[in-house]
Design a protein with these regions (language model features):
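A structural signal for multi-pass alpha-helical bundles of membrane permease subunits
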Residues: 1-170
Length: 170
């Protein structure tokens, strides 16, 4: 084990990449799924159902590789290259999936896209299960804005769902 940990360059690179990925993707996915759920929860039920399906659908798609391969294709037909070329941001297509500098951000984006659905659903169900009576009582007790509602009512009432969401992002 000592030789593997101390001398093996592949091990140290893999460990570094794993730590970077875990430190960025986990908390970002947790935060993003909560913010999106909080935003979507404000819509009327029919719109909320459509938006919930849109955010959950990527979790159901098993062929994420093919979808993202088309998006990040290295020619001018890839969605990202096509958009950046048409906006004049780049002058020639970027080979996204073979350039080391872009690979980790792309992997993080794909991971967020695929894993956010379950956390999003748990957060939106938690938001919908917070009793309206608690908000009314909070207004009587002096809560005056949405941030205070979030801090003193919503987040404490959602602790089990937030814990589940955090565990699912690991």
């Amino acid at each position: 084990y000592r030789r593997m940990i101390v001398e093996d360059a592949t091990f140290s690179t893999t460990l570094k990449n794993t730590l970077v990925f875990a430190i960025i993707a986990g908390p970002l996915g947790f935060l993003l799924s909560f913010v999106l759920a909080w935003f979507v929860n404000e819509f009327e039920p029919k719109v909320r159902a459509v938006l919930s399906f849109m955010f959950y659908a990527p979790s159901l798609v098993g062929n994420a590789y093919f979808i993202w391969k088309v998006a990040f294709s290295g020619d001018s037909y890839g969605y990202v290259n096509s958009l950046l070329l048409s906006l004049g941001i780049i002058t020639e297509p970027v080979i996204w999936l073979k350039t080391e500098a872009y690979l980790m951000p792309i992997v993080i984006i794909v991971q967020l896209w695929q894993s956010m659905g379950v956390s999003f659903l748990s957060n939106i169900s938690g938001l919908q299960n917070v009793s309206r009576d608690m908000y009314e009582a909070g207004a009587i007790d002096g809560i005056r804005n949405r941030w205070q509602e979030l801090r003193y009512i919503t987040l404490p009432a959602m602790q089990p769902m937030l814990l589940f969401s955090a565990v699912m992002q690991i």
